[in-house]
Amino acid sequence: MCDEDAAALVVDNGSGMCKAGFAGDDAPRAVFPSIVGRPRHQGVMVGMGNKDSYVGDEAQSKRGILTLKYPIEHGIITNWDDMEKIWHHTFYNELRVAPEEHPVLLTEAPLNPKANREKMTQIMFETFNSPAMYVAIQAVLSLYASGRTTGIVLDSGDGVSHTVPIYEGYALPHAILRLDLAGRDLTDYLMKILTERGYSFTTTAEREIVRDIKEKLCYVALDFEQEMATAAASTSLEKSYELPDGQVITIGNERFRCPEALFQPSFLGMESCGIHETVYNSIMKCDVDIRKDLYANTVLSGGTTMYPGIADRMQKEITALAPSSIKIKIIAPPERKYSVWIGGSILASLSTFQAMWISKQEYDESGPAIVHRKCF
């Protein structure tokens, strides 16, 4: 690894989790929830060092007395004051670096509004005094991490899912499709269907418990109807989960009904296409000559693609949509939860990339709009 003094920082700000670390490392050093919590009640304890806000894991552990807010919604930053708190926490508390000493690579959602990239650039240079920075598109980094430069990435995180076709390293913007259906919606849906079983989860703190149930017990059925029949006929698919207070709850068909919403958004009352159709539609928006390469390089990325069974189901669904002669390959790397970050780590440590950074000097000369000229 290059000397830590000037190692570039790679920060992948997701809607649910923030992943941060040093370029050249093979995994992020810090992974923490993208949340800012504020006390719900007036402090009564003496010597508690009353803070007006908590970030990340600390907010998570004190969630019972806080109101939790996510500054990134659907992949796009909506609350800049809270976002600054998260970046501050990333640099000073998690990585323990002085941001003015390291170039920083940030990631952004595909089709991020132009004003957002400018604001990110401005905050890095003016608030944190970064010597250099760059903004990269998340899905492109995931593809790099899989060792490819051509393919289609289905990137599904906590707040948003995208299908991004990439040819020779360039995202094809006209064919990028966005689906506002991701991990957070599945957590909400699981809360709802658990209520049907008579379990009640309502507060922001309880939602985090349901998220944990989802991550530990849910899976994608290869054949939904058949799985429902199996679940109805026997208890073989039931699992139990112990809540923090010791109460044990049992969950059965909810285990696969929850992620099924990715393939059938009508479960959530949404009219959009499922993830399999979205991938297919995205491919069909591309030039006919490159479609074959996209079908053969379909890469899954992000935490919401971590369900067991998702790759097999994708293979089955896309095979049903595509021409019969075509070879379809779904690539689901085991580290796909972090592949955006890993791709950023690879990119920022390439010798050929060093000329791509936006320097403080360029920013001072051109202002925030420089980001559109240098990052594409």
From Swiss-Prot:
The modification Methionine sulfoxide is found at residues 45, 48. PROSITE patterns: ACTINS_1 (PS00406), ACTINS_2 (PS00432), ACTINS_ACT_LIKE (PS01132). It is an enzyme of class 3 (hydrolase). It is found in: Cytoplasm, Cytoskeleton. Keywords: Acetylation, ATP-binding, Cytoplasm, Cytoskeleton, Hydrolase, Nucleotide-binding, Oxidation. This is Actin-1. It catalyses: ATP + H2O = ADP + phosphate + H(+). The modification N-acetylaspartate is found at residue 3. Oxidation of Met-45 to form methionine sulfoxide promotes actin filament depolymerization. Methionine sulfoxide is produced stereospecifically, but it is not known whether the (S)-S-oxide or the (R)-S-oxide is produced. Belongs to the actin family. GO terms for molecular function: ATP binding; hydrolase activity. It comes from Aedes aegypti (Yellowfever mosquito). Residues 1-2 form a propeptide. Its main location: cytoplasm. InterPro entries: Actin, Actin/actin-like_CS, Actin_CS, ATPase_NBD. One of its GO terms (cellular component) is cytoplasm. The keyword Transmembrane does not apply. Actins are highly conserved proteins that are involved in various types of cell motility and are ubiquitously expressed in all eukaryotic cells. Its EC number is 3.6.4.-. Gene3D superfamilies: 3.30.420.40, Actin, Chain A, domain 4. It holds the Pfam family Actin. It comes from the Eukaryota.
